[in-house]
């Protein structure tokens, strides 16, 4: 019965604190992204950001082409046999 009385306190503690303190890396990232070196933002993040950008653009172009293909197919009437 005693363990049930401590449950609300345990639950609130579990959600309000972290076991591992994380270092605030926002100032470091701001320094990288605010640096005036002539690079676009999608390249300043490194290799991962460049790959993610290229993948996103590829999927966008392929998806647009696929949509236009099906719009063209839908716009052409079928011939009666």
Curated annotation (Swiss-Prot):
This protein's pathway reads: Energy metabolism; oxidative phosphorylation
Q: Where is the transit peptide?
A: 1-21
| Membrane topology of this protein | Single-pass membrane protein
Localized where?
Mitochondrion inner membrane
Query: Record's CDD domains?
Result: Cyt_c_Oxidase_VIIa
Coiled-coil residue windows: none
Q: Name one Pfam family in it.
A: COX7a
A GO cellular component annotated for this chain's UniProt record is: respiratory chain complex IV
The UniProt keyword set, sorted, is: Membrane, Mitochondrion, Mitochondrion inner membrane, Oxidoreductase, Transit peptide, Transmembrane, Transmembrane helix
> What does the record list as GO biological process?
mitochondrial electron transport, cytochrome c to oxygen; mitochondrial respirasome assembly; regulation of oxidative phosphorylation
Quote the disruption phenotype from the UniProt entry. Answer: Reduced body weight due to diminished lateral muscle mass, leading to reduced swimming capacity. Mitochondria show reduced formation of mitochondrial respiratory supercomplexes with CIV dimers, leading to metabolic alterations and non-pathological muscle performance decline.
TM annotation in the entry: 51-72
* SUPFAM superfamilies (alphabetical): Mitochondrial cytochrome c oxidase subunit VIIa
Q: Any idea which GO molecular function terms this record carries?
A: oxidoreductase activity
Please tell me where this protein is predominantly located: mitochondrion
The subunit structure is: Component of the complex IV (CIV, cytochrome c oxidase). The complex exists as a monomer or a dimer and forms supercomplexes (SCs) in the inner mitochondrial membrane with NADH-ubiquinone oxidoreductase (complex I, CI) and ubiquinol-cytochrome c oxidoreductase (cytochrome b-c1 complex, complex III, CIII), resulting in different assemblies (supercomplex SCI(1)III(2)IV(1) and megacomplex MCI(2)III(2)IV(2)).
Q: Which family is this sequence assigned to?
A: Belongs to the cytochrome c oxidase VIIa family.
Q: What does this protein do?
A: Component of the mitochondrial respiratory complex IV (CIV, also named cytochrome c oxidase complex), the last enzyme in the mitochondrial electron transport chain which drives oxidative phosphorylation. The CIV complex is the component of the respiratory chain that catalyzes the reduction of oxygen to water. Acts as an assembly factor that specifically drives the homodimerization of CIV complexes, mediating the formation of mitochondrial respiratory supercomplexes (respirasomes) containing two CIV: supercomplxes with two molecules of CIV show improved activity.
| UniProt protein name | Cytochrome c oxidase subunit 7A1, mitochondrial
What species was this sequence derived from? Danio rerio (Zebrafish)
Question: Lineage of the source organism?
Answer: Eukaryota, Metazoa, Chordata, Craniata, Vertebrata
Query: By which gene is this protein encoded?
Result: cox7a1
């Amino acid at each position: 019965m005693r363990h049930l009385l401590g449950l609300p306190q345990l639950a609130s503690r579990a959600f309000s604190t972290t076991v591992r303190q994380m270092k605030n890396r926002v100032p470091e990232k701001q320094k990288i992204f605010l640096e005036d070196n002539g690079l676009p933002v999608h390249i300043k993040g490194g290799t991962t950001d460049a790959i993610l950008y290229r993948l996103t653009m590829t999927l966008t172009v392929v998806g647009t082409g696929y949509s236009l293909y099906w719009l063209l197919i839908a716009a052409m009437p079928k011939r009666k046999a």
